Amino acid sequence: MGAKGFVMLPDQGPVWNMAPGRSATLKMQSGETGESLMMFEEIAPVGTTTNFHFHHYSDEMAYVLSGEITFKIGEKITVGGPGTCAFMPRGVPHAWKTTGGETARVLFIYTPAEAGKALEELQQLQCPVASRPRQVFQRHGTEAVGPPPF
């Protein structure tokens, strides 16, 4: 049986408290979408960044709702504010950082959902992102290839 349709209201969805002031609200989980996609909204204070990494099995998209994000996709660096969209295809190293002077809100989508399953698992455990639970990310096809490039 395929996925059932549903509506997720703004104040709904399980929250992963990743670090003080940083959270991810899971808006569409893999099991709800027949594993076709996973979507979450991240609140990222200024200075929040990711390691340079890539996904083996999922493409990643980002849509900046507020604040400013600097993306590095492959060798290209782009700074964008609200309305900026980014596509990070599987196999291409990428990273991002909250820049500018305010906390950012960013909507992220993985398709298919495999890479997002790591976030679902970490939300259940309420594991702080600083512990860098690499084995969870690796299990779901995400591989770090370097430190934050910013």
Task: List PLM regions with ranges.
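Short acidic-glycine-tyrosine-enriched beta hairpin
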Residues: 7-9, 15, 32, 68, ...
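Hydrophobic small-molecule pocket/channel-lining residues, especially in calycin-type beta-barrels
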Residues: 48, 56, 69, 87, ...
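A short, N-terminal "cap"/entry segment at the start of jelly-roll beta-barrel domains
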Residues: 1-37, 124-150
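Short, conserved beta-strand element in jelly-roll/cupin
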Residues: 39-45, 54-72, 109
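A hydrophobic/aromatic-rich effector-binding and dimerization subdomain
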Residues: 109-130
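Histidine-centered catalytic micro-motifs
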Residues: 51-57, 92-95
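Ligand-binding loop in jelly-roll beta-barrel domains
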Residues: 70, 81, 90-116
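Conserved short histidine dyad/triad with adjacent acidic residue
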Residues: 9, 23-26, 40-55
